[in-house]
Amino acid sequence: MSELELAFQHVAGASAPEAERVQAWLEPVFEAHGRGGELTVRIVDEDESRALNRDYRGRDKPTNVLSFPCELPPGLPAEAAQILGDLVVCAPVVAREAAEQGKPEADHWAHMLVHGALHLLGYDHEDPAQAERMEAEERRILAALGVPDPYQER
């Protein structure tokens, strides 16, 4: 497995964790699945999040995290397969959700990044069985990071 190469784009004015912390939260996700490669994490405001969510998911509202797996056309060299995709995180939404849920903002950032990374690896939560599998993996990785179960009632 190769290392995780993170491109960090902080384009929103809102506060966000440092790139090193973001990488520390993401590396265990890809290590656990024997994957490495290039990943872009873009921190955005609500306007950009809303536009992307509307254009790609048909939902005209900002959201906490969007995952864009890299879909390469056939015939590209093997090195190209090392591009994992992009995560777009809306800093104001993550901050608001953390406050509403009564949890430390850093814990919610870790959860949203792990959640988004799992989507890049093919996890989903469209039906109860998928959601259970994905949430179990989130809990396992977050526990290893010292982050409490995000699904436990507070």
UniProtKB/Swiss-Prot annotation:
Where is it mainly found?
cytoplasm
What is its subcellular localisation? Cytoplasm
Q: Which domain of life is it from?
A: Bacteria
Q: How many cofactor units bind, and how?
A: Binds 1 zinc ion.
Q: What's one Pfam family here?
A: YbeY
Q: Which cofactor does it need?
A: Zn(2+)
Q: Which GO terms describe its biological process?
A: rRNA processing
Could you tell me the EC number(s) of this protein? 3.1.-.-
GO cellular component terms listed in the entry, alphabetical order: cytoplasm
GO molecular function annotations of the record: metalloendopeptidase activity; RNA endonuclease activity; zinc ion binding
Tell me the keywords, alphabetical order. Answer: Cytoplasm, Endonuclease, Hydrolase, Metal-binding, Nuclease, Ribosome biogenesis, rRNA processing, Zinc
Where does the chain bind Zn(2+)? H115, H119, H125
Name the job this protein performs: Single strand-specific metallo-endoribonuclease involved in late-stage 70S ribosome quality control and in maturation of the 3' terminus of the 16S rRNA.
Q: Which family does it belong to?
A: Belongs to the endoribonuclease YbeY family.
According to UniProt, the name of this protein is Endoribonuclease YbeY
Question: What organism does this protein naturally occur in?
Answer: Halorhodospira halophila (strain DSM 244 / SL1)
